[in-house]
Amino acid sequence: MAATAAASSLQMATTRPSISAASSKARTYVVGANPRNAYKIACTPHLSNLGCLRNDSALPASKKSFSFSTKAMSESSESKASSGLPIDLRGKRAFIAGIADDNGYGWAVAKSLAAAGAEILVGTWVPALNIFETSLRRGKFDQSRVLPDGSLMEIKKVYPLDAVFDNPEDVPEDVKANKRYAGSSNWTVQEAAECVRQDFGSIDILVHSLANGPEVSKPLLETSRKGYLAAISASSYSFVSLLSHFLPIMNPGGASISLTYIASERIIPGYGGGMSSAKAALESDTRVLAFEAGRKQNIRVNTISAGPLGSRAAKAIGFIDTMIEYSYNNAPIQKTLTADEVGNAAAFLVSPLASAITGATIYVDNGLNSMGVALDSPVFKDLNK
């Protein structure tokens, strides 16, 4: 993402590449004429993961990653945030639906929002709730909770949630009797929204990080109607339901985001069971919801099309490691995509800095979506890369 300095007061830029080394000196370039009003842009590896650099020493020189992100800093003190262009979510409250562990995109989004100052509430799938809360309580996630200032991300409250059910009347008897739901209550979308209202009054940010396709490994021609509709229900309509029920308690000027995938518009063999259709529906719904929520309550709605990540949930696809390798070999930016990069994009999208962005699909995939033909195709075997 390129940053443009529109105001004359932004005069200096500092970039610090992070290439597997522990640290490197920043370079400063004067881009304006008035150094007394200058600001510095200091580099951090990731907003939500300051100082955690990946060791690429085992990779060939041509395949080592090179990335930097920027954080506005005052010239008088590089340890204090500048009033220039910070992502500031202090005083904001976010509800993130779909976190069940610490290695997916939902967790990374939560961490980036927390790093920017937001208060974090989480909705966790009921069968995973006990394990998730126990892991939090026993400190299993403490290492991945570390924020740039050294503190641990605080999850203010974890709510049970099954977003395929809008209200208690929708829950079938076999689910009510299922032992995995025993001991939990108020976990439909309607009930979760009401519990958040009772506990906190309102929220500013709603994040949808939910997807499930029970027949994802099946080709579309072999997918049952039940499996197809289940994928749509869990992966796309759940966003409509969440926004519909949480909108009344969202503060005007807030924002909502979801996570999608390039299979919505390109053929990804193996990503079946109706999941490609579900992602296409999610993106289409994003545009409609942006209009409706925007006009009704000044709420922005966007979706992030993230590249492949080897999370526990993605392992269900079966070929996720192949997709990660494919992305590395063929994307314009040849590096491994991290969850933090998606989290940081989310923090930007829900912040006032993105106040004019709504109804958009934002690609965070090292540019893979822009490619027409894979570079590892035999067509390009003699191409000088």
Swiss-Prot record:
One of its GO terms (cellular component) is chloroplast. InterPro entries: Enoyl-ACP_Rdtase_NADH, NAD(P)-bd_dom_sf, SDR_fam. The keyword Lipid biosynthesis applies. NAD(+) binds at residues 98, 105, 162-163, 209-210, 259, 279, 309-313. One of its GO terms (molecular function) is enoyl-[acyl-carrier-protein] reductase (NADH) activity. Catalyzes the NAD-dependent reduction of a carbon-carbon double bond in an enoyl moiety that is covalently linked to an acyl carrier protein (ACP). Catalyzes the last reduction step in the de novo synthesis cycle of fatty acids. Involved in the elongation cycle of fatty acids which are used in lipid metabolism. Required for normal plant growth. This is Enoyl-[acyl-carrier-protein] reductase [NADH], chloroplastic. The lineage of its organism: Eukaryota, Viridiplantae, Streptophyta, Embryophyta, Tracheophyta.
